Structure formats: C-alpha cells, structure tokens
Amino acid sequence: LHPETPREGRSLAELFAGRDIEPMKRQMRKHMAEAGLEYGERTHTYNSRLAQALAKWADTQNGGQAIYDALYRAYFVYNINLSDIGALVEIASGLSLDGNLARQVLEQRSFREAVDADWERARQLGITGVPTFYKNDLAVVGCQPYETLERFVKHLTKT
C-alpha cells in the first residue's frame, strides 16, 4: 500500500528502483494465468484512495458489488489511473451506476471517513500489501499459490 503515491501515479521502475522488476512481473503474469485472471502490462502504480471511496459508495447502490471486478480490470488489465475522477466516473457509469452521483461523491470526498477508518484498521493489523487475507490474527499477504490459501482456510476451519 502506497498512500503517498501522487495523483499521476508512479512508474514501477521508479517504485522498485535498483531492482530488476522483470522477474517479478513474469511471476505475477504466471500466477494470474494459473488463476485464470487477466493481467495486462502494468507500467505504473496509482493512488487508490478515490477508487476505495467509489467502492464504498457503490456498496450502497443497487448492483454496486460489480465495482470490484471493474476496478480490478481497470487497474490490473488496462493500467487505468484510479486516482483520476473522470476515469472512475466512467467505470461507475459503465456499470449503470449514476455517474453524476459518483462524481459528486468523489469530488466532495463523501466517503473519506470510511476510507480513513479502513486504512487505520489496516495499519493496526500490520497490513502493508494487497491482497491480504486476515482472520484470527493470522495473515496471508501478497500473491500466493493456491496451496498456501488452501492451508490457511483449512487451519481456520480447525480452530
């Protein structure tokens, strides 16, 4: 999680300066392909606070759950800047959510407190990356093989 990321984003080369990121990108593409998930050629990381606010709002709307898949595709498949209000409004409108209301919510920062609360909870739990699966003080962080997640779930069902 990089809350300090500027609105225009940060190139992955800058974020991981001094490290060879190509092996990491190949590994990520491999994991995504194995999971049957689309994954584009990402060049940047973007500040996702506004996308999180949009998702909080969408949760209050009929059919809003579709926002999660749409935001995933926008970010990981199409490399769309998720801190751009216009792009987020377009994503919401594409799901038949009220684009004007989405813009208003984003411009007025109507869900700022809810997003802040989520970030504070993440800090309290020591969550520093996504995805993170957390339950009963146990966490699985980052892109993990299926077997790791399976062991995590099996452990949870035994306790």
Where do the protein language model's features map onto the residues?
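C-terminal cap of thioredoxin/glutaredoxin-like
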Residues: K56, T60, A66, A70-T159
